[in-house]
Amino acid sequence: MSRTRNLARPLALLALLLAAAALSACGYESEEKEVVEGEPVTLGELKYNVIFSRFLNPDDNEDSAYLIGQPTPPPGSAYFGVFFEVQNESEEPQTLAEHFTIHDADHQKFEAIESESLYALPFGGEVESQEQIPVLDSTPETGPIEGSLVLFELPASASENRPLTLEIPGPEGPAEVTLDL
């Protein structure tokens, strides 16, 4: 038997296995509910993506727009913003989560606070069919970060107790997003 023929059979088998693996992955979407900032997570019919998170400075011109109506944070604490894009790819309006929570490595929990800012994500609001939050051409969508804000007040020590994990409730259970702090 020739050397070429000896190699042909294993190569053909390898090609067949690779083709089968590629076909089985077609249309695959992850059901992962633990992601890192920048990776989308699907909850029900909504796809949430934390596009950016950071501490906010009330004395900064850009940040002051995110903090409209908020009092000066107490000593030892600071405002923290989590900026989202949420997609509804379904044929029906979908309801956004009504609350958001951050956990630190010491298992302390911090609840999101209401915001009067034009950039605020509307807790419990609706996302129309085939639409997104922030709505196209809206203030948050055209702003510097291009996302809707969920606001937290965190102790200054929170940055020392990393990772910070954002919990988003969903119809089949919560998702967790590890924030890039």
Task: Give the residues covered by each predicted segment.
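Bacterial N-terminal signal peptides that target proteins for export
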Residues: S2-L13
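C-terminal motif of bacterial Sec signal peptides marking the signal peptidase cleavage site
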Residues: A21-A25
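Conserved functional micro-motifs across diverse proteins
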Residues: C26-L181
